């Protein structure tokens, strides 16, 4: 599927920027250690691939999805092969004591990417998943930023959502709270964020769901739950 053709573009949106700064990017990545949290999701996998192909000094990927992590490794080995740096994956929850043990033994990292999130509005339909959403989107961000500061990371990056602008649901509100916390902490740590809209064909997206229905020869549905 040609996604560019589907959305009416001839070139990737940031293609020129990436190409123009390719030498600087390659130089920075080659001599740096990276930690990618939530690296087995759609955005996380894309970020991990971009870092890996520039041969980082170390690239460690954390995600709770063991299956997605295995597929990520298979995909990278099939397309990029092996680099000269260290590449490790860990099937861990970044809110766990096991993650803290990982940081204690594997840190420091120069760049920390926090791409983990509960991103669906439907996840706030019950109090249990809602509590998990707040834990992941807010408190795990606070925790991972604290660890990044303690290890002396050069930069901390976190993904947000367009729904954080004038939020009308708890998912957007949780990300807005996260943004406010990070903006306050940016006085003592270099931090950047990016608000993502709905990412076409990402896991759980509507377009991904359409492909699934086609593949399984199922009718389209409009669930009310």
Name every feature range the model reports, one short phrase each.
Residues 170-225:
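NAD(P)-dependent short-chain dehydrogenase/reductase
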């Amino acid at each position: 599927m040609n996604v560019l053709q589907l959305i009416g573009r001839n070139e990737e949106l940031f293609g020129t920027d990436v190409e123009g700064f390719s030498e600087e990017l390659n130089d920075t990545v080659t001599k740096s250690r990276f930690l990618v949290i939530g690296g087995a999701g759609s955005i996380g996998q894309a970020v991990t691939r971009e870092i890996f192909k520039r041969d980082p000094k170390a690239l460690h990927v954390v995600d709770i999805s063991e299956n997605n992590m295995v597929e990520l490794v298979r995909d990278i080995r099939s397309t990029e092969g092996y680099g000269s740096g260290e590449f490790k994956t860990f099937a861990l929850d970044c809110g766990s004591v096991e993650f803290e043990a990982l940081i204690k033994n594997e840190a420091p990292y120069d760049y920390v990417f926090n791409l983990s999130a509960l991103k669906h509005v439907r996840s706030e339909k019950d109090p249990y998943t809602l509590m998990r959403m707040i834990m992941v989107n807010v408190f795990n961000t606070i925790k991972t930023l604290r660890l990044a500061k303690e290890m002396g990371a050069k930069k901390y990056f976190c993904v947000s959502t367009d729904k954080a602008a004038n939020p009308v649901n708890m998912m957007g509100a949780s990300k807005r709270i996260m943004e406010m916390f990070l903006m306050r902490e940016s006085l003592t740590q270099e931090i950047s964020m990016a608000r993502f809209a709905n990412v076409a064909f990402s896991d759980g997206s509507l377009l991904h769901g359409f492909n699934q229905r086609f593949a399984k020869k199922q009718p389209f549905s409009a669930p009310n739950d």
